[in-house]
């Protein structure tokens, strides 16, 4: 029985000592992690700015606006015509006298 208690005590001490060593081990340095993170974000921002300066993005934006303009112009004109016709019909209704009730 004493032998079993001694073995259990020895196993417990060894496991606690191992946990203590793990806690004392140097973990990743937080400052270096932040430095790496900010450096990668800076590099990404620089790459993005270089891509934005290229004429490819500008030409794509110009093509998009031209296409949108071509598609919206007829729609706006037809909406304007419909609005004028609607107001004209309202004006014609107001000009007609209502029949008198008998």
Curated annotation (Swiss-Prot):
The modification Methionine sulfoxide is found at residue 49. It is found in: Secreted. One of its GO terms (biological process) is negative regulation of cholesterol import. Keywords: Amyloid, Cleavage on pair of basic residues, Disease variant, HDL, Lipid transport, Oxidation, Secreted, Signal, Transport. GO terms for molecular function: apolipoprotein receptor binding; cholesterol binding; cholesterol transfer activity; enzyme binding; heat shock protein binding; high-density lipoprotein particle binding; high-density lipoprotein particle receptor binding; lipase inhibitor activity. SUPFAM superfamilies: Apolipoprotein A-II. One of its GO terms (cellular component) is extracellular region. Monomer. Interacts with NAXE and NDRG1. Belongs to the apolipoprotein A2 family. The apo A-II stoichiometry in HDL molecules varies among inbred mice strains, because of structural polymorphisms affecting the apo A-II gene, which influence its translational efficiency. The sequence presented here is that of strain BALB/c and C3H/HeJ. This is Apolipoprotein A-II. It comes from Mus musculus.
């Amino acid at each position: 029985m004493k032998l079993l208690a001694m073995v259990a005590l020895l196993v417990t001490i060894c496991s606690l000592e191992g946990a203590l060593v793990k806690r004392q081990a140097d973990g990743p340095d937080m400052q270096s992690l932040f430095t790496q993170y900010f450096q990668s974000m800076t590099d990404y921002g620089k790459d993005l700015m270089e891509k934005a300066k290229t004429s490819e993005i500008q030409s794509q934006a110009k093509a998009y606006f031209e296409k949108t303009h071509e598609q919206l112009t007829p729609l706006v004109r037809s909406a304007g015509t419909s609005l004028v016709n609607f107001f004209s019909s309202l004006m014609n209704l107001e000009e007609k006298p209502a029949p008198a009730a008998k």
